[in-house]
Amino acid sequence: MGYYSLTEVTAVQYAKEHGYFEKKANVVCHEIGDGNLNYVFKLDDGEKSIIIKQALPYAKVVGESWPLSIKRATIESKALQIFAKYVPEYVPVVYSHDEELAVTVIEDLSRLSITRTGLIDGEEYPLLSQHIGRFLAHVLFYTSDLGLESEEKRVLEGTFVNPDLCKITEDLVFTDPFGHYDTNDYEPELQLTIDELWSDKTLKLKVAQYKYKFLTRKEALIHGDLHTGSIFSSPSETKVIDPEFATYGPFGFDIGQFIANLLLNALSREEEQRGVLFFHIEKTWSYFVETFTKLWIGEGVEAYTKEKQWLPIILQNIFTDAVGFAGCELIRRTIGLAHVADLDEITNKETRIQAKKQALSLGKELIKYESKNADIQLFRTLFQQTVSGGIKA
């Protein structure tokens, strides 16, 4: 029959035909997707529920003028299964994948909340940083040359060649926000700040280096879009979703993106409400280091993991990259194509513009920061300097 786009009616038909519900079951279906690239349907017959996700052959945020390969759905399904191999407690269950229709049937996580929405609403997720730190350590270690035999790693790397979505990252994260491109989207009040950003040659040179790292460093399987909208949470659970951008890339990329989105939420808050975000930033890194170190000692397959002096070098390189990638994410989420509700939903215009200027300033400082001895306190320090006026855009 070939590919066709599902509707709420045909999604129910599909689910019944594939045995998820009885033929006579009264199944309620709603399209619940709020993302940029896919349809997401929730189906419920009162006794059980499932999620059907379908990749569209174009970017929903733009329309059919921006075509995309539906093969990204297969990459997403495979990534979730790889993640589940190492940390099943942190991802939804994949029930099935239909490559022809680009349909994946997965566990319904309605018991949880989208982490971005919860953080905006002031919800507390005390285990978020522990879970994400451990998730990242396991996935990055076990899919790299450190924890995977080189032959297996090369085969796996080939499975996650993801040109369409990597191109989106290359453009929307590393290129477009740093120059005059039609994809950019920002308030006129930011123009002077942006002009200064775009004329900063030192900044652009650093961004070029981070983009080149993304293009060339195939160190481990990365989620590729690990922001707080790609995570479901409750006080006791954390589930990482939507790895359709998954590819082989730098160790520090996902860490930087996650931290950047916590910083964006911190910028939307009053000073006395920011502490929990820095708790999560710092604990994410400490749990990552703790878990990565244990895996290095106990599970390393690369011969040089026996050299104790190499581990701190690897960890410092990961941290340095995470700092720069976080800076790029801050800037692109502020003036690029895909914004975040943390900033855009600040109701007072003056406060919103000020927060966005601070995001641009902080992003610039993180990208340009150079020190081989920095630690996780760097994010708190530069943030405080930025919001206090010590750093100007």
From Swiss-Prot:
Subunit structure, as described in the record: Homodimer.
Pathway: Amino-acid biosynthesis; L-methionine biosynthesis via salvage pathway; S-methyl-5-thio-alpha-D-ribose 1-phosphate from S-methyl-5'-thioadenosine (hydrolase route): step 2/2
Catalytic activity line of the entry: 5-(methylsulfanyl)-D-ribose + ATP = 5-(methylsulfanyl)-alpha-D-ribose 1-phosphate + ADP + H(+)
Entry keyword Amino-acid biosynthesis: yes
Residues that bind ATP: 38, 53, 107-109, 242-244
PANTHER family per record: METHYLTHIORIBOSE KINASE
Similarity comment: family membership: Belongs to the methylthioribose kinase family.
Role description: Catalyzes the phosphorylation of methylthioribose into methylthioribose-1-phosphate.
Positions in coiled-coil regions: none
HAMAP family: Salvage_MtnK
InterPro entries: Aminoglycoside_PTrfase, Kinase-like_dom_sf, Methylthioribose_kinase
Gene: mtnK
Name of the protein in its database record: Methylthioribose kinase
